Each structure stands twice: as structure tokens, then as C-alpha cells.
């Protein structure tokens, strides 16, 4: 495993970050920090010093070459709080809503990950896609096959990437070729936790796909894992689609709704992340808030599968932590800028105006907070892990034109969010090292 070199590194350019986590969007502007000519000093993969170039340049030894990115914009690495790596090859599958889509497209694709060599090949592709889109941390679904998770963690470990992932637990209501059992899912997950959790920057998430595909016996095994390894994460889906919710209620009639299934099995709380949450009942909003659970907002996926519109305003009101998720492969892009672009539209339809600052927060420090990692990543505070992206605000002729006609910082950020894509990502750094550069 590689880690950041011991020698000092110096990066110069324009920087933007949010210096503290917040409880309502009105606070973001006061927490935002923009340094037009800044200096980032990195040592052993961590932020050693950050501030104005003039205040820090005397700290740079003569032997150190400064990486000069003036004219670009340097931001903390993007955080993707919900994505399926074994669905990369089926992005853009036509014409279905959630339950039909799973059976027709997802399950046959995930079957291929039984082959370790195939899983390794796709893990390498997946991580390259994350990096070329500026994503440096992700919460990731594997498949039911433990080797799918081994392959992903192996690939992430080569660049010492901050990643949380887990093996899908699924013992019913899916094709026989993809089912495990309550017992086997427990033992396989336990082995993966022992092998990978807190190995370098890797972390493990207990990952029941969603309540309909886990029997009560398997949910009890997920609970047992969480009790035995309380510092692991939990990653699953919740209230994405109305038919799904009705199905859960029919399968678990003794529970008080969908979220209550997870709650009664001890799968709510800090570091428990629920993707989608488009159709929550009031009591479910309250429970997510009370338990300090988190939501992954996945706009491109919710639009693509016709699932519905996520209510971000309500999440702020209820003080529920939210991060952004691309949700590849129901989501249609690895790119966080495009994901924020779609989030803006989802919220416009509800009369809520997502500012560029708020969007930027959700994709960086807010996402880190939703994953319980805000003490490690998300901004440029000294001691934080040095994951960051050098962005090109004028990557296309249209972006150049629009940038030239933008006056304020918030306007320039908003233009990047609406017109930007993978061409906007000039360089990506993980653990203080360059891991992607645009040709």
C-alpha cells in the first residue's frame, strides 16, 4: 500500500472550501473560505499548512518545486455517498422503474462479479472513473460475492483512497444465482470486516441491499454484525419508490413502516446511510433525525427511474444529515458537477433554490459529515487528509464565454455546476499525490 511521501509538497492557486459543518444553509456563506492566491503545504498525505501565498511562501524549502495552478480553482475532493460499482456497465439501461429495472438489468449484470478477475477489471475501471470526475471518497455497494469487495478494496488500496464498501446481503426475492443465506452473509461479511475495515483508509459498510431482499433472519445477522463491530458503517436503500414501500409493508406487516424495519434491527444511527428517502413519512423523518442517521440524495437516479423528488428543505428543517450520491447505474453520471446540476432542477420543481455554495457544501464537507468523516476530509484544515481537485472553470468554449460574463464567485461556481462535467476536472489528488491528470 502506498501513502503520501514524507517530503513536503507545495501547491499554489485559488482555493475554496467550507471551514465548518453547518446546521442550516443560511450559515454556509459565513463558513465559506476563498483564497485567490493560496498555498497548500502537504506532508505525509495530510494538510501541513494552508493560507495566503504571501503568508506561507517562506516555509517552502528551495529544493521543493511548487505546483502552480493559478488560473484554476482548487477544491476539496468530492464525496459520493451512494454508488454501485458493479452497475457501471449498465448505466443508461432503458425504460423501467425500480423493481422491474432490478430484475431486468441489475441482477444479470451483478452475476458477472462472481469472477474475481472480472471484478478486478471493473474495479480498476470504476476507480479511474471516480478520479477523472474528481471524486476522492465514496460509499460503495459491491455485489453478493465477497470477491467483488476484495477486488474493489485491493484497487483502492493501491492509491490509499478513502473508501467505504461492503458485500451485499441478499437471501430472498432475487434470482437464485445471486442469493446468499443469513448464515453465509454473516460469515462472509465478518471475514471482509476483519480483512479490510480500517486497513489504511478503507472502511467497511454492512450492506443489506434493501429490506425486501433480506429475510428477518438475515436482518438479525446484520444487527449481530453491527453489534460486534460497532465502528462499521451501514449502507442500504430506503423509500425510493412507492411500489417498493408497499412491498416492504407486506413483507414486514408487524413493523411500523419501512424505516422501522431497519430501526428494530439496530441499523439506524450515526454512520448509517440511507439512499434516496424520496417518500418518507413524517415519523420517518423524525426517526432519522433522532437517531442521527444520514441520507444520500441521488437526483439523477431519482429522475431516471421516475422515483420522485427528494425534499432537501425538509431534511434541513429536521436536521437530518445529507450527502450527494451519483447512484451509478440508475444514476447516469459519475460526475458530481452534473449531479448537482440535476439536484438544482429537482429542487426547483419544489420551489427550493439550491445555491452554488450549498451545493458545493453538500458535495464536500457536507458529504463528509453525512459519512461521519468530517474530522478527516472535506476541507483544507491542517491535519485533514490531502484529497483535492484542481478544476478548470473554462474547459469548453461555452464555459469560457459564460465565465467571462460572470462577476461574483457564487455565479462562477454556479456556472461550473451547471455547465461543468469531467472536462472540468484538470487534476485529482488523493493522499497528497497526483492520481489523475486530464490529457
UniProtKB/Swiss-Prot annotation:
Q: Which EC number(s) does the record attach to this protein?
A: 3.5.4.3
A single Pfam family it belongs to is Amidohydro_1
Positions bound to Zn(2+): 82, 84, 237, 327
What cofactor(s) does the depicted protein rely on? Zn(2+)
One cellular component term (GO) for this entry is:
cytosol
- On whether Hydrolase is a keyword of this UniProt record, the answer is yes
**Which pathway, metabolic or otherwise, does it act in?**
Purine metabolism; guanine degradation; xanthine from guanine: step 1/1
Q: What class of enzyme is it?
A: hydrolase
Family annotation (InterPro entries): Amidohydro-rel, Guanine_deaminase, Metal-dep_hydrolase_composite, Metal_Hydrolase, Metallo-dep_hydrolases
* One GO biological process term: guanine catabolic process
Q: Which GO terms describe its molecular function?
A: ammeline aminohydrolase activity; guanine deaminase activity; zinc ion binding
Supply the CDD domains for this chain: GDEase (cd01303)
Report which reactions are catalysed by this protein: guanine + H2O + H(+) = xanthine + NH4(+)
What are the alphabetically sorted keywords of the record?
Hydrolase, Metal-binding, Zinc
Tell me which residues bind substrate. Answer: 84-87, 209-210, 237-240, 327
Any binding details for the cofactor? Binds 1 zinc ion per subunit.
Q: What does this protein do?
A: Catalyzes the hydrolytic deamination of guanine, producing xanthine and ammonia.
Task: Name the family.
Answer: Belongs to the metallo-dependent hydrolases superfamily. ATZ/TRZ family.
- PANTHER family named in the record: GUANINE DEAMINASE
What is the protein's name according to its record? Answer: Guanine deaminase
Amino acid at each position: 500500500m502506498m501513502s503520501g511521501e514524507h517530503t513536503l509538497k507545495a501547491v499554489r492557486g485559488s482555493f475554496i472550501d467550507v471551514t465548518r459543518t453547518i446546521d442550516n444553509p443560511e450559515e454556509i456563506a459565513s463558513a465559506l473560505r476563498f483564497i485567490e492566491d493560496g498555498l497548500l503545504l502537504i506532508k505525509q498525505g495530510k494538510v501541513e499548512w494552508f493560507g495566503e501565498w504571501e503568508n506561507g511562501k517562506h516555509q517552502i524549502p528551495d529544493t521543493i518545486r511548487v505546483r502552480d495552478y493559478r488560473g484554476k480553482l482548487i477544491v476539496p475532493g468530492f464525496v459520493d455517498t451512494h454508488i454501485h460499482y458493479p452497475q457501471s456497465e449498465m448505466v443508461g439501461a432503458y425504460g423501467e422503474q425500480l423493481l422491474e429495472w432490478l430484475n431486468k438489468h441489475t441482477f444479470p449484470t451483478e452475476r458477472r462479479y462472481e469472477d474475481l478477475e472480472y471484478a478486478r477489471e471493473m474495479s480498476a475501471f470504476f476507480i479511474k472513473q471516480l478520479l477523472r470526475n474528481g471524486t476522492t471518497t465514496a460509499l460503495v455497494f459491491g455485489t453478493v460475492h465477497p470477491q467483488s469487495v476484495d477486488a474493489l478494496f485491493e484497487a483502492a488500496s493501491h492509491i490509499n483512497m478513502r473508501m467505504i464498501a461492503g458485500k451485499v446481503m441478499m437471501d430472498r426475492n432475487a434470482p437464485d444465482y445471486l442469493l446468499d443465506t443469513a448464515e453465509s452473509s454473516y460469515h462472509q461479511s465478518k471475514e471482509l470486516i476483519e480483512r479490510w475495515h480500517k486497513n489504511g483508509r478503507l472502511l467497511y459498510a454492512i450492506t443489506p441491499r434493501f429490506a425486501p431482499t433480506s429475510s428477518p433472519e438475515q436482518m438479525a445477522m446484520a444487527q449481530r454484525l453491527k453489534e460486534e463491530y460497532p465502528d462499521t458503517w451501514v449502507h442500504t436503500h430506503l423509500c425510493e419508490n412507492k411500489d417498493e414501500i408497499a412491498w416492504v409493508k407486506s413483507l414486514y406487516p408487524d413493523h411500523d413502516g419501512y424505516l422501522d424495519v431497519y430501526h428494530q434491527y439496530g441499523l439506524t444511527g450515526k454512520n448509517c446511510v440511507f439512499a434516496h428517502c424520496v417518500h418518507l413519512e413524517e415519523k420517518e423523518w423524525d426517526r432519522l433525525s433522532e437517531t442521527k442517521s444520514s441520507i444520500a440524495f441521488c437526483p439523477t437516479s431519482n429522475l431516471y427511474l421516475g422515483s420522485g423528488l427528494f425534499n432537501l428543505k425538509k431534511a434541513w428543517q429536521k436536521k437530518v444529515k445529507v450527502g450527494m450520491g451519483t447512484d451509478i447505474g440508475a444514476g447516469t453520471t459519475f460526475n458530481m458537477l452534473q449531479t448537482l446540476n440535476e439536484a438544482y432542477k429537482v429542487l426547483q420543481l419544489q420551489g427550493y433554490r439550491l445555491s452554488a455554495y450549498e451545493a458545493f457544501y453538500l458535495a464536500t464537507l457536507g458529504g463528509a459529515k453525512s459519512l461521519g468523516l468530517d474530522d478527516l476530509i472535506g476541507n483544507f484544515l491542517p491535519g485533514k487528509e490531502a484529497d483535492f481537485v484542481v478544476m478548470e472553470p473554462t474547459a469548453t468554449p461555452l464555459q469560457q464565454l459564460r465565465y467571462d460574463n460572470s462577476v461574483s464567485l457564487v455565479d462562477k461556481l454556479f456556472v461550473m455546476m451547471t455547465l461543468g462535467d469531467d472536462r472540468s476536472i484538470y487534476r485529482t489528488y488523493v493522499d497528497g499525490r497526483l492520481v489523475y491528470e486530464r490529457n
